[in-house]
């Protein structure tokens, strides 16, 4: 940090210059990432559960996922699970308790500001996801994963899925009490893991509910990644589904999010 000086009787008095907005945001981002990686519950959500699901589901019959080799269909779904773990469940729980203890209101009155706080949260989510993808990618490669599709399309789906679930997580955290956010975020997470079309594609469910599952953002995210990584095609329908959910989430945050 640079310092400016002012003339007073008796000499020069240093006057610290204000840090740039981006420096403040990056400092908060580093704090958010460090806090998440040191939190046992967050590590369980972001690393342990996705890794366990990856190794466990890699042994299921190909009929479960409708594709062989199984690992090629499982890995994109586990990437989707990792995104939901970080951008939705982890973000909602952390923000909910920060809101309860007045951290959001306090940070909103500092040089970081509300926009800076949201920017730091968003960047920290992306950084943690990158760590997850490296960790899971290495594990999947050990199991034989060999993606032949389009990484460019996959990145588009990942960014859109992150924005979608982050907006939904913030909406949950900004409208409910911390305890309610904790309970509902975990219930939604477990529900999506089981019946959200994440690891097992929506078209493998009974016809009566497969169409409903395909409308969920979790299914759109996982199916979009499978289309990109396996077939190398742009998942237009899944992208539109995510865009709709993202727009709804952003609208809800702008309208109902409360800082205290």
Q: In which residue ranges do the predicted regions lie?
A:
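Short amphipathic alpha-helical coupling elements at transmembrane boundaries
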Residues: 27, 31-35, 105-109, 210-214, ...
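Transmembrane alpha-helix boundary and packing residues in multipass membrane permease domains
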Residues: 54-59, 137-141, 170, 219, ...
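Helix-loop-helix units of permease transmembrane domains in multi-pass membrane transporters
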Residues: 94-126
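Alpha-helical transmembrane segments and their short interhelical loops
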Residues: 114-187, 233-243, 247-250
């Amino acid at each position: 940090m640079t310092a400016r000086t002012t003339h007073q009787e008796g000499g020069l008095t240093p006057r610290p210059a204000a840090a740039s907005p981006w420096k403040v945001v990056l400092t908060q981002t580093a704090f958010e990432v460090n806090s998440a990686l040191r939190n046992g519950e967050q590590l369980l959500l972001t690393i342990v559960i996705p890794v366990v699901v990856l190794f466990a589901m890699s042994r299921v019959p190909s009929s479960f996922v409708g594709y062989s080799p199984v690992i090629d269909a499982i890995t994109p779904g586990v990437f989707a699970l990792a995104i939901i773990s970080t951008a939705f469940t982890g973000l909602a729980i952390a923000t909910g308790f920060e809101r309860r203890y007045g951290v959001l209101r306090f940070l909103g009155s500092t040089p970081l500001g509300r926009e800076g706080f949201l920017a730091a949260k968003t960047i920290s989510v992306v950084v943690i996801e990158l760590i997850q993808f490296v960790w899971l990618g290495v594990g999947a490669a050990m199991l034989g994963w060999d993606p032949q599709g389009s990484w460019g399309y996959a990145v588009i789906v990942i960014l859109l899925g992150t924005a979608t679930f982050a907006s939904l997580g913030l909406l949950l955290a900004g409208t409910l009490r911390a305890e309610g956010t904790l309970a509902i975020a975990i219930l939604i997470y477990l529900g999506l893991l089981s019946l959200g079309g994440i690891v097992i594609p929506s078209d493998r469910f009974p016809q009566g509910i497969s169409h409903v599952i395909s409308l969920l953002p979790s299914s759109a995210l996982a199916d979009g990644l499978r289309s990109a990584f396996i077939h190398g095609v742009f998942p237009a329908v899944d992208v539109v589904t995510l865009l709709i959910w993202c727009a709804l989430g952003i609208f809800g945050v702008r309208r109902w999010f409360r800082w205290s």
